[in-house]
C-alpha cells in the first residue's frame, strides 16, 4: 500500500471526521488505556500483527466455513482493525485477511504507535452512526470526550467490539457488563487503582443521547 505522500494517507485515515477528530493528547488517557487493554494488550510490543492470534483466527475462519456458522472472532491487532476499517470491507475471506496484514505492517512502518492509536480511536464505530470517541461522547452523553469520567469512558469503549450487541440504546445491560469486565482488566494491568475501579464499577451510567445519525451494525 503506497501513497504519494504522508499527508495523503493521513487525509484518508481522518476521512470526513475532522470536526470531531481528536489529537492523541486530546484523547482521554482512560479511553486510550481501555482500548488497548480490551482490544490489543500487546499493542505497544508487536509490529502490527500478532501472528499467533491471527493463526488461531484463521483456524476459526476455516471451521466457520465448514460448519456454515459465524464462529470467527478476534485475532486482529488494533493496527489490523484500523487497516480493515479504513481501507477494506468487512467480508471474511482469506484474501481480505492477507491484505489486512500487509496494510497493517505498512502502517506500522509509516507511523508511531501513538499515531496509530489516535487514528484507530477516531475511526472506530460506536453504533448508531457515531464514529470516533468524540462523536460517541457527544452522542451518548451530550458532552465532549474530555469531560468523560472513568466509568463513562470505559462504557463507551465497550461498544466497538460488537456495535450491534453492545449498542447502549438497545442493549444497555450488555454494554454495562462489558464495561465492568474492561474495568477489571484495567485494574489487573495497573491502569487504575482499586479505589478508581470500585467507584467506576458501581457508578450509575446515565445516558443523555442525542438523535442517532443512523443505525448500522
Over which residues does each language-model region extend?
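Juxtamembrane regions of bacterial inner-membrane/periplasmic proteins
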Residues: 1-217
